[in-house]
Amino acid sequence: MAEHYEHPYPSSELESQYPFVHYEHERFTEEEMRNRAHDFYEQMERRRSVRMFSSDPVPKSLIETAVKTASTAPSGAHKQPWTFVATQNPEIKHAIRVAAEKEEEINYLENRMNKEWQEALAPLGTDHHKEFLEIAPWIVVLFEQRYETNVDESTSKNYYVKESCGIAAGFFIAALHHMGLATLTHTPTPMNFLNEILDRPKNERPFVLFPVGYPLKGVKVPDLKRKDLDEVLFSC
């Protein structure tokens, strides 16, 4: 199909009202694209969730770069409805662990989790013990901003908040793995205690918690198999 657009973007009217710039894009040969795609896939295919971390320190600059990468994610109306809170403070990490384990004890030991959920988790061997929340050098919590608060205390709506935060979380995980760090998507249920411990405003809600660090030497992970391509991709 010829590259003819009846409705060019941006329109001259739109461009007269809002700033636009030329998109800087480098086009590779098909061979280069295949090589880049294969290398990236091979790297990401080795990514695993880790539950045992080394306590070796991780520079703050690496966490900052991962968050900057996450913040390049697309979001509804470009509202970027997320806040990342990172801490390496031992007292704060201890408080998070205590609160998380309290909720998880109810989930695992008092059957707040239904039987089907527990059976699904069985191959992972998870339980209410969350030592990694103190041992990992960093805890990073991604909060979703349900709405924005303005200087005059008025509020503005955010759009596709969960979808936007989910994409940002994926970028964050990929950035960590790319630089040689490990993480885990941890969602103790409920997570409201994180607002209090991390002193977050009421318009923010915990979305996911990431312990971040180097994997413990010799750590084992479940021998899981990912779905084949023909199970996740259908071409029309």
Task: Name what the model sees in each region.
Residues 1-65, 88, 98, 106, ...:
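N-terminal accessory segments that position/regulate proteins before the catalytic core
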Residues 2, 86-165:
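Glycine/small-residue-rich phosphate/adenosyl-binding loop
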Residues 78-81, 134-136, 205:
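Short, basic and Ser/Thr-rich N-terminal targeting/leader segments
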